């Protein structure tokens, strides 16, 4: 009998997306603050940062709602190798496990420190959250389109969640997003367009590479990660926000110049 491996490999030297999603989060978040629970949002950001720091080849994360999208490249240097040899099953299962374990740790820490007593909230923390993940290749020219698609989804989610916090489902039935924005402003005096950017369209965890030189002339680089709460729209000029991570050869020369000038 012939047995075949089902552990497929992604294409090397091609961008990889790992998409991490919360499972049944509509149940997990029941009783949380609406429309934007600060503890939940902080836990998602911290989890995204943790994944960035611990997943080989990760250069960017975009998180919105219960979703984290990670961008991995394995061509930054000639000797760069892919995480777990780009084995699809391994990438997805380990990313999901890492997200699940860390999220459940950090949300308890944040929640117990900052959140007011809430029976539903405590029950959710006791049960814990669970994440699933998938991994796939995208051509370089399609990566920004993917992140723009997820950002548009974030905007729709934000408008819908804000509407649901102030109106009944029957009041929102068959209402387009623009109509919901108008209802919020006219009936509740809430201007969705003036919400903080991260509440409208999510946040990114971005990497900065710092170069320095030792006395012997050797150049060393260190990575730092930070949260961008004021991300642009990933269209037009905003496309470069993503694309600069897809073409490291072009941006690395600029980083070296900056380091030398400093």
Regions found by a protein language model. Name each.
Residues 1-262:
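Regulatory and interdomain segments flanking nucleotide-handling catalytic cores
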């Amino acid at each position: 009998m012939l047995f075949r491996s089902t552990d497929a490999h992604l294409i090397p030297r091609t961008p990889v997306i790992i998409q991490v999603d919360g499972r049944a989060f509509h149940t997990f978040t029941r009783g949380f603050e609406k429309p934007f629970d600060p503890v939940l949002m902080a836990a998602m950001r911290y989890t995204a940062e943790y994944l960035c720091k611990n997943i080989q080849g990760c250069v960017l994360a975009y998180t919105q709602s219960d979703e984290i999208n990670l961008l991995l490249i394995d061509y930054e240097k000639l000797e760069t190798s892919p995480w777990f040899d780009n084995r699809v099953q391994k990438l997805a299962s380990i990313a999901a496990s890492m997200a699940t374990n860390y999220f459940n740790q950090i949300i308890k820490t944040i929640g117990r420190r900052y959140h007011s007593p809430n029976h539903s909230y405590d029950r959710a923390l006791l049960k814990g959250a669970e994440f699933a993940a998938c991994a796939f290749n995208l051509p370089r020219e399609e990566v920004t389109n993917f992140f723009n698609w997820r950002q548009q989804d974030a905007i729709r989610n934000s408008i819908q969640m804000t509407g649901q916090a102030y109106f009944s489902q029957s009041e929102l039935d068959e209402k387009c997003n623009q109509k919901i924005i108008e209802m919020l402003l006219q009936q509740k005096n809430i201007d969705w367009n003036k919400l903080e950017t991260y509440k409208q369209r999510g946040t990114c965890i971005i990497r900065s590479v710092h170069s320095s030189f030792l006395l012997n002339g050797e150049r060393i680089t260190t990575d730092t990660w930070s949260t961008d709460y004021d991300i642009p729209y990933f269209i037009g000029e905003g496309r470069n926000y993503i694309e600069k991570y897809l073409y490291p050869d072009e941006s690395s020369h600029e980083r070296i110049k900056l380091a030398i000038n400093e």
